[in-house]
Amino acid sequence: MQHHIIKSLAVLALGAMLLTGCGSSKSLEKQLAKMPQKAMLLSEVTERGLTLDTLETVYPSGMSQWSADSVPQEYMLSWQKFIYGLRNALVAEGMNWTEPYSLWGRAYFAPDGTVDHYFYTWRGKSQPSEEWKAQFREVLERFLATYRFEYPMNRRFAQCGGVSLRPAQ
């Protein structure tokens, strides 16, 4: 009788996994692998039928393993280095801007800390020109190709945040 109950529970657990989408991450991974580049606007991602919620099944939040007040300082410093690294890459590539620009982005990291994807959207009243946005995307692609998140996670994860690009003084 006990063996029969355990077997029934195993079948129920498998059914629950299938219903919650645990079995669908492989098809999502294939869809992500077909993305034309690492950096894409959020609108382009949603046009492909993806949402941040579905992406979270493959790339859970990097901070989800900690409570809000116990996130390691080294993790937060690694994220700040990502943001500052992006700004420094723009400056190093000779990009100039005279108005402050703001964007929100979500980075998707591989277990070794390399960037699999970065999806973003421009925010605020001040918007860059289409030419500037195209150049930004090129620089962003080069930056993402070589960047490695310093805090060791050893699993896929996502981190999001705003990026403020203030003009150089």
What are these regions (language model features)?
Residues 1-10:
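Bacterial N-terminal signal peptides that target proteins for export
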Residues 23-169:
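Charge-biased low-complexity segments
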Residues 19-21:
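C-terminal motif of bacterial Sec signal peptides marking the signal peptidase cleavage site
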